Regions:
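N-terminal single-pass transmembrane signal-anchor helix
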Residues: 1-19
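Intrinsic disorder/low-complexity signature
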Residues: 13, 27-30, 36, 55, ...
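Compositionally biased, intrinsically disordered low-complexity regions enriched in proline and serine
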Residues: 16-19, 38, 87, 108
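Membrane-proximal N-terminal amphipathic helix
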Residues: 20-49
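Periplasmic/extracellular, small/polar-rich flexible segments of pilin-like filament-forming proteins
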Residues: 43-146
Length: 146
């Protein structure tokens, strides 16, 4: 019986390590896909399409000062099926928010300083560090929308 208990304990530890790694990798994958999506879909506007992001982005607004906000809101709507791997009842993608608290784990946050969009995620706890300075953070840098 003791052997079964030991094997069960080892199995639980291994399983927890596996699920933790899977969640971390899911956040990384979601983050990468969001960045690619923004770049590819805004390129449609640059090349003359009238809409992008499944019709959520009106390319005719490209010259407006708040274009980055239109883009971020369109991304949030078009990718609303992305779920936070750490809490699948919640959407993963938000325009706004931060990645510096443990509550931010698993979210993909878009910020729009200047004429750019910044995409950042906390892939595992602890998240509480200066933004984009921890190995637990994935940050895209700035995606230029012009």
């Amino acid at each position: 019986m003791a052997i079964i208990g030991i094997l069960a304990a080892v199995g639980v530890v291994a399983y927890n390590g596996y699920t933790s790694s899977a969640k971390k990798n899911a956040v990384k994958s979601n983050h990468k896909n969001v960045v690619k999506y923004i770049v590819n879909e805004t390129m449609k506007c640059i090349t003359g399409e009238s809409t992008a992001m499944g019709g959520e982005l009106d390319c005719t607004k490209q010259s407006q000062n708040n274009w980055k906000d239109f883009v971020a809101k369109a991304v949030e709507k078009s990718l609303s099926d992305f779920k936070n791997p750490y809490d699948t009842s919640r959407k993963a993608l938000t325009h706004g928010g931060d990645i510096t608290n443990d509550n931010d784990v698993g979210y993909i946050r878009m910020r729009s300083p200047g004429s750019k969009i910044e995409v950042m995620s906390c892939i595992q706890t602890p998240c509480s560090a200066t933004r984009c300075s921890s190995d637990n953070h994935v940050c895209s840098g700035d995606i230029n929308l012009n």
